[in-house]
Amino acid sequence: VAAEQRHDGTWRDGAWRGAWATSPQYPTAPFGPNWSQQGFSNHTIRQVVRVTTGGTRARIELSNRYGTKPLRITGATVARTDKGASVKAGSVRQLSFGKGRSVTIPAGASTYSDGVPFTVGALESLTVTLYLAEETGPATFHTFSSATSYRADGDHRSDRNGTAFTESSDSWYYLSGVEVSGGQAPRRDGIVTFGDSITDGVGSGPNANNRYPDELAERFAAAGKPRGVVNHGIAGNQVTNDWAWAGEKGVERFKKDVLTEPNVRTVIVLEGINDIGGSGPSIPGQSPTPEVSVEQIVEGHRELIRQAHAKGLRIVGATLTPIKDSAYDSTVNEAKRDAVNHWIRTSGAYDAVVDFDRVVADPGHPDRMLPAYDSGDHLHPNDAGYRAMAQALDLDAL
C-alpha cells in the first residue's frame, strides 16, 4: 500500500487538536452489508460523531486512502446533532476546501476542510454531511462505527430534518477526523487509543458512545479537564500482519493513524490478541494468516514503542484481555497471551502499563472474562466492561 499523502500540501499546525478520529479501512464487507464496495453516486451521507474536546473553530479530515480513483466531494456541511439524521435549526455551516465548496481528493490521499467558526463543547455530538454527486467507486470507510450513518438520494447536505435519509449503515465513510481550535491555549495533551476491536468498541451498545476511549473522555470532562481522546482501533487488526478486512498491520498503520495526530502527548496500545487468535488455521469467514510467535508480537510492540519515542510521545502498554471460552480459546493461544502479558507487565519497555487483563478478568477464574463484563462472546467486553477499563486509567498519569 502506498504511503498516504496530504492532498492540500499542508501539515497540521499547533492550533488544531484532535477531537474525534477513526482509522480508514479498505472497502470490504466481512461482517454484513455496508456501502463501501458499491460506493456512492448522487448520494448524501450524514454521519454523527461525538467530540471529546471543544473549541471555537472546527474542520474535518476526509480520506480516500483506499480509493481506486479521485474522489469528488461536491459539498459538505457540519451541524449540531438533533435526533437521528436531523440537525438543530440554524446550526448548519457550509464547509469549504481551499475556499471552494468542492474538492477532488486523489486516490491514496486525504484532505482537510478549511476551519469554520463553530463553537462546540466537549462531549457534544456533531453531524457531518457529504454530498457526492459523481460516482465514487469503492469507498474508504471504517467498518465498526457503533453509530448509525444515513444516506439519501440527491443533494440534502443542508436539510435540517432527516426525512430524506431513508437508508442507514453502521459504518463511517470517508470521514476520518474532526479537529478543533480556540477556546483554550494550545497545549500538547491529546491521547490516542490504538488497537483492535476492543479499542474499536465491539460489544458496546449502538449510538451510546460507551467504548473505553469514550468513557475515558467522559472522566476527563467530569474532572473539569477535558482533552482530546481519539480512537484508532480497528476490529481484527494485528500488530504483525495485514488483513484486507482488518487494516494494515499495526506497525505500519501506527505511522499514518497515530503519528499524524496533532498535539498528542500519550498513546495507549492494546493490540496483539488477533495475532494470537487469528493466526494459523483459518477461522470461518476469514483467510488464514501466518502463525505468529510470542517473539514476533513482542518485537512488534517494541517497534511501536520506538516509533512513539522517536516522535516524543509517551506510550502506555495494555495487557491482553481474557479469551477463555471464546473463538480464540486454546491451550496454545492462552500460553501465548500469558507470555505477552508477562512481557508487557515486567519488561519496562513501555513508559507505563495498564493491566486491562486483571481489570476485566473473573477473580475466581482469571483466564475468563468476568460475566458482568462479558458482551456474550467471551472475548469483547460489554458497556460495563469498557467502563471498568476506563476507570482503571490514572488521569493524572495520563
Regions found by a protein language model. Name each.
Residues 1-194, 204-206:
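N-terminal secretory targeting modules
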Residues 20, 41-47, 70, 74-79, ...:
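Conserved SGNH/GDSL esterase-like catalytic core that processes O-acyl groups on lipids
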Residues 63, 131, 194-197, 231-237, ...:
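Active-site-proximal beta-strand/loop segments in catalytic clefts of secreted hydrolases
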Residues 238, 277, 284, 320-398:
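Catalytic His-Asp segment of secreted/periplasmic serine-dependent ester chemistry enzymes
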Residues 248, 291-302, 334, 338, ...:
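Non-membrane alpha-helical structural segments and their capping/turn regions in soluble enzymes
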Residues 301-309:
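Surface-exposed amphipathic alpha-helices with a cationic face
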